[in-house]
Amino acid sequence: MSSQDTLTIAGKSYQSRLLVGTGKYKDFAETRAALDASGAQIVTVAIRRTNLGQNPGEPNLLDYVPPSRFTMLPNTAGCYTADDAVRTLRLARELLDGHDLVKLEVLGDPTNLFPNMPETLKAAKTLVDEGFKVMVYCTDDPIQCRMLEDIGVVAIMPLASLIGSGMGILNPWNLRLILDQSKLPVIVDAGLGTPSDAAVAMEMGCAAVLMNTAISGAKDPILMASAMKKGVEAGREAFLAGRVPRKLYSGVPSSPTEGLISTAK
C-alpha cells in the first residue's frame, strides 16, 4: 500500500488504520507485544482503569507503551454521565502533559455498554469548547452522527455491534448512510471479531477500525493482532482498487470467445 495513503485525524497523519485498545491483556508486556504485532500507531487507554502515573508504586502502562512511540488516545470507558466523562478527560490531559486528542464514550447500560447519546452529545460540546480534539464512540444513527459532526468533533466512531460481542457489522446500511454523509473520518468501533470483519469495514470505505477484545480475548492475542493488521490492509486495498459491481448475470464471459481453436475435425 502506498505510503501516501494515510489516515489523517485532527491534522496528523498515520500509516496504520488499525487502532488498538490496551485493556484485558494478561500484563503490560503482552499489551506491548500485541501492539507491535498490530502495527498500530494510535492506542486507546481507559483512564479510570489504567495506571498512567496516578498510582505510584504500581506498574505504569507508559513504561511499556511510551507516548514517544505511540499516540495515546485516552478514553472514558466506565463513564455513564457527561460530567464524569468530562472530568475523566480533564484528568487525562493533566497526566499526559496537555495531550488533547481523546476518545469520548458515555455509556447508557452496564449490561450492553450501548452509548447514551444525549449525554454523549452534551459531553462532546463541553470538550470541544474546552479545546479537546474529540473522537466519539456513538450509535449508528446517521442523524446523531451528523449532530456530533456539527458540534466539531474530529472523528465519528459508530459501533458495528455491542462492545466485546464479536458479532461484526450488524447494520451495514446505517453505516453506509454515515459514510455517505460524513466529511470526517468514520472509524468502526466495537463489535468486530475477526480479520474478515475488519476487512468488510475497510472495503465499505471506513477510514479505520478500533478494536480491543477481538485481539486481547483471542487464544493467541499476538497472532490475532498480526491477522487483524493484514485484514485492515487487505480491506483498504480492496476499497482503493474498486470492486467489480454486483450483478445477477454477467452477460459477458470472463474468458475471450473470439479466436478460439476449433475442435471440429
Curated annotation (Swiss-Prot):
SS bond list: none
Main subcellular location of this protein, as a coarse class: cytoplasm
Listed Gene3D superfamilies: Aldolase class I
The organism's place on the tree of life at top rank: Bacteria
Pathway: Cofactor biosynthesis; thiamine diphosphate biosynthesis
Residues binding 1-deoxy-D-xylulose 5-phosphate, per UniProt: G164, A190, G191, N212, T213
Localisation per UniProt entry: Cytoplasm
Catalytic residues identified in the record: K103
Keyword terms of this UniProt record: Cytoplasm, Schiff base, Thiamine biosynthesis, Transferase
Coiled coil: none
Class of this enzyme: transferase
Pfam families documented for this protein: ThiG
GO cellular component: cytoplasm
Catalytic reaction(s) noted: [ThiS sulfur-carrier protein]-C-terminal-Gly-aminoethanethioate + 2-iminoacetate + 1-deoxy-D-xylulose 5-phosphate = [ThiS sulfur-carrier protein]-C-terminal Gly-Gly + 2-[(2R,5Z)-2-carboxy-4-methylthiazol-5(2H)-ylidene]ethyl phosphate + 2 H2O + H(+)
Molecular functions (GO terms): thiazole synthase activity
EC number(s) from the headed UniProt entry: 2.8.1.10
Keyword Transferase appears in the UniProt entry: yes
GO biological process, one term: thiamine diphosphate biosynthetic process
CDD domains in alphabetical order: ThiG (cd04728)
Cytoplasm in keyword set: yes
Oligomer and partners: Homotetramer. Forms heterodimers with either ThiH or ThiS.
Protein family according to the UniProt entry: Belongs to the ThiG family.
Free-text function comment from the UniProt entry: Catalyzes the rearrangement of 1-deoxy-D-xylulose 5-phosphate (DXP) to produce the thiazole phosphate moiety of thiamine. Sulfur is provided by the thiocarboxylate moiety of the carrier protein ThiS. In vitro, sulfur can be provided by H(2)S.
UniProt protein name: Thiazole synthase
Species per Swiss-Prot/TrEMBL record: Bordetella avium (strain 197N)
